[in-house]
């Protein structure tokens, strides 16, 4: 055996296997998901990621430099503009997806099809939506062992607040009744 390599038992490796049939979607992992155009199902596969839901279930909890989620939504639905302090990669599995970035008149967009890939740099405001005609799935990967939280435009936070959601000091979702 080479120096620096490990041997793992099957039981040890099975803690690092996520079966699609066992995954349960989280429809309120982010503050924007209560807004109709941003409804989506999120599946945290590897690592907690940047979830604003402290009770978010994760399939594989060992995190070694990245977090991965599956994203599913109906046509026209997706995620609001937001930013991360780390890189974010999007890979469509099914359907067509619009990945858009920058705010206002500086806005740009690219349409991705299955197995295309885009890597959005840290700090760039980005969003996405299903640009196809059927429910579609995409993989999202956020870099870093500690992916921190999302930065949202003030308009999105205000609209979410109007639905009864807000973020606490740690960046976790609170219902209005729990926040008061």
Model features per residue range: what roles?
Residues 103-121:
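Short acidic-glycine-tyrosine-enriched beta hairpin
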Residues 2-15, 127-180:
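Double-stranded beta-helix
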Residues 50-55, 67-84:
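Conserved short histidine dyad/triad with adjacent acidic residue
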């Amino acid at each position: 055996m080479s120096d620096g390599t490990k041997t793992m038992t099957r039981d040890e490796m099975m803690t690092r296997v996520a079966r699609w049939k066992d995954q349960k979607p989280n429809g309120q992992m982010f503050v924007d998901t209560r807004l109709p155009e941003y409804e989506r199902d999120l599946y945290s596969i590897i690592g907690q990621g940047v979830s604003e839901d402290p009770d978010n279930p994760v399939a594989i909890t060992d995190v070694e430099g990245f977090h991965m989620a599956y994203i599913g939504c109906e046509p026209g639905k997706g995620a609001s503009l937001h930013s991360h302090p780390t890189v974010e990669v999007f890979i469509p599995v099914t359907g067509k997806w619009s990945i858009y970035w920058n705010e206002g008149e500086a806005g740009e967009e690219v349409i991705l099809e299955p197995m295309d890939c885009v890597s959005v740099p840290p700090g760039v405001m980005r969003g996405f939506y299903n640009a196809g005609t059927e429910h579609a799935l995409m993989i999202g990967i956020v870099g870093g062992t500690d992916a921190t939280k999302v930065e949202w435009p003030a308009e999105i936070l205000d609209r979410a607040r109007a639905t009864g959601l807000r973020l606490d000091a740690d960046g976790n979702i609170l219902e209005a009744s729990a926040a008061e």
